[in-house]
């Protein structure tokens, strides 16, 4: 009886760009040896929209609605970096109340982004129940955003020198209620997920990257901190009012998919702590624009003093960026989001270079998945947290 001959050729398959677990229009060309992944090549560009070139023919206020389409699940961060770059280049002072409001919005956006990461990530590995619980809390954050900004996702809220409008009456109390509501729900997620033997069997030891490799690849955010690197730009760069708040950097030494999950869960808890403190310490004063009140009151207006006239003044729509260059970065939910800005005494930037965290984090994917099973590729990709809007720009 003759033995059946098996084919030793490798198989090349396409995943995406419309596969449900691709998190957007990502395409992966995967080389398989049986069920084992031999190679994986990400193919980008399906969502490229010339975001950097568009910036060169727009004022900052005109460009703000565009930037919410980079990482469309954490739009407060793309707005923050867009106004921080010209503010630091031109030395614009931001009132304390506006800085506190910004931090509250940024941390709410971080929680919303991590929640929307956790739901699809669990669905990718076959657990659909947590998805529905997680979206329940995410909707509450979007309700807070809608009350403050008028928009649920694309907020267009940040401005050079502050924010667009002050917080509405009763908003602070609603935000406090949410901060009391969320921690027990995070405990509920952990009871459902963290020690679930099926979950741990799917993610433990999977997609490992060590400390040195994480640094050498230029990883940032939860991808870097899950590999044992205690590095958070909110502590390193001292921007906004993070130094005035008591909080800890969430990090882990596991370096695998489970560690990245643990770091993001810890970050949600720390964000709640920060929001609570910022709400309690929220100062009075201008949020951005006292110019209208000063003009309506005439030359004897109480708003006519030096501080209010200049520090609390709304920037002009034709705000000119001085000649010079500057790199600004913030700690976004997915890592270091940066902008390299070159100004030339014009209302338009001469160069606007975006440093998206997802693009750099995606580069390490072939290394993470090499030698794993095809079914594990989705879990590893989900743990990286890719949003193609910011990858392709």
Curated annotation (Swiss-Prot):
Disulphide bonds in the chain: none
One example of a Gene Ontology biological process annotation: photosynthesis, light reaction
Catalytic activity from the UniProt record: a plastoquinone + NADH + (n+1) H(+)(in) = a plastoquinol + NAD(+) + n H(+)(out); a plastoquinone + NADPH + (n+1) H(+)(in) = a plastoquinol + NADP(+) + n H(+)(out)
Assigned keywords, A-Z: Cell inner membrane, Cell membrane, Membrane, NAD, NADP, Plastoquinone, Quinone, Translocase, Transport
GO cellular component: plasma membrane
EC number(s) per entry: 7.1.1.-
The protein's enzyme class: translocase
GO function terms (MF aspect): NAD binding; oxidoreductase activity, acting on NAD(P)H, quinone or similar compound as acceptor; quinone binding
Primary location group: membrane
Subcellular location: Cell inner membrane
Membrane topology of the entry: Peripheral membrane protein
Pfam families: Complex1_49kDa (PF00346)
UniProt cross-references to InterPro entries, sorted A to Z: NADH_Q_OxRdtase_suD (IPR001135), NDH1_su_D/H (IPR022885), NiFe-Hase_large (IPR029014)
Segment forming the signal sequence: none
NCBIfam families per record: NuoD, PRK06075.1, PRK07415.1
Subunit structure: NDH-1 can be composed of about 15 different subunits; different subcomplexes with different compositions have been identified which probably have different functions.
Described purpose of this protein according to its UniProt entry: NDH-1 shuttles electrons from an unknown electron donor, via FMN and iron-sulfur (Fe-S) centers, to quinones in the respiratory and/or the photosynthetic chain. The immediate electron acceptor for the enzyme in this species is believed to be plastoquinone. Couples the redox reaction to proton translocation, and thus conserves the redox energy in a proton gradient. Cyanobacterial NDH-1 also plays a role in inorganic carbon-concentration.
Similarity annotation: Belongs to the complex I 49 kDa subunit family.
Stated name of the protein: NAD(P)H-quinone oxidoreductase subunit H 1
Organism this protein belongs to: Gloeobacter violaceus (strain ATCC 29082 / PCC 7421)
Record gene name: ndhH1
């Amino acid at each position: 009886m003759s033995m059946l001959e098996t084919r030793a050729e490798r198989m090349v398959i396409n995943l995406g760009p419309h596969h449900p677990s691709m998190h957007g229009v990502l395409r992966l060309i995967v080389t398989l040896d049986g069920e084992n992944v031999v190679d994986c090549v990400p193919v980008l560009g399906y969502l490229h929209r010339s975001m950097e070139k568009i910036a060169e023919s727009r004022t900052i206020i005109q460009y703000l609605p565009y930037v919410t389409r980079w990482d469309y699940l954490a739009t407060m961060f793309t707005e923050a970096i867009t106004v921080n770059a010209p503010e630091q280049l031109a030395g614009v002072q931001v009132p304390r109340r506006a800085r506190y409001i910004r931090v509250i919005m940024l941390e709410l956006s971080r929680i919303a982004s991590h929640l929307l990461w956790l739901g699809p990530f669990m669905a990718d590995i076959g657990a659909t129940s947590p998805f529905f619980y997680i979206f329940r809390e995410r909707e509450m954050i979007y309700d807070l955003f809608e009350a403050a900004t008028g928009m649920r996702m694309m907020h267009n809220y940040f401005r050079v020198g502050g924010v667009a409008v002050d917080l509405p009456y009763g908003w602070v109390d609603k935000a406090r209620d949410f901060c009391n509501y969320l921690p027990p729900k995070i405990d509920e997620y952990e009871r459902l997920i963290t020690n679930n033997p099926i979950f741990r069997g799917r993610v433990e030891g999977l997609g490992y990257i060590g400390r040195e490799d994480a640094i050498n690849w230029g990883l940032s955010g939860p991808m870097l901190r899950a590999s044992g690197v205690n590095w958070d730009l909110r502590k390193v760069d001292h921007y906004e009012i993070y130094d005035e708040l008591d909080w800890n950097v969430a990090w882990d030494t596991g370096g695998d998919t489970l560690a990245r999950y643990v770091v993001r869960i810890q970050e949600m808890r720390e964000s709640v702590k920060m929001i609570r403190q910022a709400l309690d310490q929220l100062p009075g004063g201008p949020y951005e624009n006292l110019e209208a009140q000063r003009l309506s009151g005439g030359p004897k207006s109480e708003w006519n003093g030096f501080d209010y006239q200049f520090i609390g003044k709304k920037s002009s729509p034709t705000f000119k960026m001085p000649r010079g260059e500057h790199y600004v970065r913030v700690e976004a939910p997915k890592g270091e989001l940066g902008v390299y800005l070159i100004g030339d005494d014009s209302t338009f930037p001469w160069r606007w270079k975006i440093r998206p965290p997802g693009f750099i984090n995606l580069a390490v994917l072939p290394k993470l998945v090499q030698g794993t099973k095809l079914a594990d590729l989705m879990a590893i990709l989900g743990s990286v947290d890719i949003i193609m809007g910011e990858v392709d720009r």
